[in-house]
A protein has these predicted regions:
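Gram-negative bacterial Sec-dependent N-terminal signal peptides
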Residues: 1-23
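A residue-level marker of the well-folded mature domains of exported/periplasmic proteins
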Residues: 22-336
Length: 336
């Protein structure tokens, strides 16, 4: 056997021995299962997914990466959608879940079929799945801590929650209530669901305002602050301190209020581009890379001194955003 053939055989043996670590993903298919698209954050999330995955397909990294969104935020509908993706033979399914627990059965089915499942934002509890999230409880707590710094005497708070039943809504709300427990000068006098959408939030707040005492602050989850402000204005009530959620209309309103009367607040949310991180994590796992089952990414916070820059780089009608590259995903997986 020639030295060339011997070297070739050795390299082949090394490649086979490396197994999944040398996996090829160019012929693999990754699908996104999304439970809801009815607000600007979800629209930005889908747009980021489309942008990054189209380039990944064009570059030959994966064969395809389509996104599928259910018509209603229903667990049964999303479960059926995921079952269909299993039958279609996708290699990985990225999930923004309608429930942290109710999809566990179908997620386990996917895992048992050899499919990689990566959940993000609305994560799932099934142990076989991967999870990508921010510290949503902390996101709730820091709003109350900010209120305590601005309103040391405390007061009544109105809480605007997100989409009922979703992990994110429960976690942020739990953090808000933990913050209030540590700052008893505040009292939550009402909680409404705004579904992370300005129009829904405005209607919900308008519905409870007539029965509420004076409100010192409004704690939110994103996509609802501007709607709350409009509801207070329509009711002829003073504008309270409202924490915001990085949407362009909220940031524009904040800038206008700062110019008009010195209004200051803070804004915080998970970047919708986290969907692109989930895509790259799925691709890395398919490529044989070792990735922790639970990954935490920082939330995106905007303060008074970063408002102008953030607004200038946020597309009108969208959300302040960060999109991830493969190198970014590798850094997150490495805990950097």
């Amino acid at each position: 056997m020639s030295m060339f053939r011997l070297m070739g055989a050795s390299l082949l043996a090394m490649t086979v021995g490396a197994g999944a670590a040398m996996a090829e993903t160019s012929k693999m298919r990754i699908a996104l299962s999304n439970n809801y698209a009815g607000n600007s954050w979800r629209q930005a999330m889908l747009k980021s997914w489309d942008k990054i995955t189209k380039k990944a397909v064009a570059d030959g990294i994966v064969a395809e990466a389509p996104a599928f969104t259910t018509a209603e935020n229903q667990v049964t509908e999303q479960a059926a959608q995921i079952q269909n993706l299993i039958l279609q033979g996708y290699n990985a399914i990225v999930v923004n879940a309608a429930s942290p627990t109710a999809l566990n059965g179908v997620v386990k089915q996917a895992c048992d079929a050899g499919i990689v499942v990566v959940s993000f934002d609305g994560i799932v509890n099934e142990p076989c799945a991967y999870r990508i999230a921010v510290d949503f409880k902390k996101m709730g707590r820091i709003q109350v801590e900010y209120m305590a710094g601005r309103l040391p005497k405390g007061g009544n708070l109105l809480e605007i929650r997100g989409l009922a039943g979703v992990f994110v809504d429960d976690a942020i709300s739990a953090g808000i209530h933990e913050g209030v427990a540590k700052n008893p000068q505040f009292k939550i006098v009402s909680s409404v669901h705004g579904d992370w959408a300005q129009d829904v939030a405005q209607k919900a707040v308008a519905g409870v305002l007539p029965s509420l005492p004076p409100i010192a602050g409004v704690v939110t989850q994103g996509g609802d602050g501007y709607g709350a402000a409009r509801a207070f204005a329509a009711a002829g009530r003073p504008t309270p301190l409202i924490t915001l959620g990085n949407r362009s209309d909220e940031l524009q309103w904040w800038k206008e209020q700062k110019t008009a009367n010195g209004y200051e607040t803070m804004s915080v949310s998970i970047a919708p581009g986290v969907s692109t991180l989930a895509f790259w994590v799925a691709q890395m796992i398919l490529d044989g890379k070792q990735v922790p089952k639970d990954l935490t990414v920082p939330f995106l916070q905007i303060n008074q001194d970063t408002l102008e820059k953030s607004l200038a780089t946020t597309e009108k009608g969208s959300v302040a955003n960060v999109e991830y590259s493969l190198d970014d995903a590798k850094a997150v997986a490495a805990g950097k």
